[in-house]
Design a protein with these regions (language model features):
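Metzincin-family zinc-dependent endopeptidase catalytic domain
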Residues: 15-123, 130, 134
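Post-HEXXH active-site segment of zinc metalloproteases
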Residues: 134-148
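Fold-level signature of zinc-dependent metallopeptidase catalytic domains
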Residues: 4-14
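Short strand-loop junctions, especially beta-strand C-caps/beta-turns
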Residues: 10-12, 105-107, 146-148
């Protein structure tokens, strides 16, 4: 990983019970310094039914990351996300601006540890894109494209 990268971990609307654990795991695995912030009010986003357009969250994430002095941003949101070409997405990353967003609405389980592991895996996947990692054909790799 490039050195001196700092990540803003932005929770939209709520902080999950395992936010500290997520921060710790990401920091250890990716060797990043991480700051946590909460944005209680969602920014406006285009809608398709109950879903929200994933890319609409990246500009506000960029603004907040820059104001916090962070080079990378990762948003966590409960709302279901989409991009025009797909029915839904678990997350979206923009390597150009080093921002990503992950939705956990499709990861929810009655077992909190299962939910956490799913969220952590998707966060690492999207952050991998920020470091220009491509999709992988190996289904055991975190960069595997899940819709295959």
């Amino acid at each position: 990983m490039p050195e001196n990268n700092e990540l803003l971990l932005l929770f939209f609307q709520e902080v999950l019970p395992f936010a500290s654990k997520l921060k710790k795991e990401l920091a250890e695995y990716l060797k990043l310094k991480i700051r946590i912030k909460v944005m209680l009010k969602l920014p406006p986003a285009k809608r398709r039914g109950q879903q929200k357009l994933a890319s609409d969250f990246l500009p506000i994430l960029l603004t907040l990351s820059q104001s916090a002095g962070c080079q990378l941003g990762l948003g966590i949101i409960a709302d279901d996300l989409y991009v025009p070409a797909l029915n839904f997405v678990f997350g979206l990353a923009s390597p150009r601006i080093k921002m990503a967003i992950v939705s956990y609405c499709r990861f929810l389980s009655t077992n909190e540890e299962v939910t956490f592991k799913r969220l952590l895996t998707e966060c690492v996947h999207e952050l991998g894109h920020l470091f220009n990692l491509p999709y992988c054909q190996n289904s055991h790799c975190v960069m595997f494209f899940l819709i295959h």
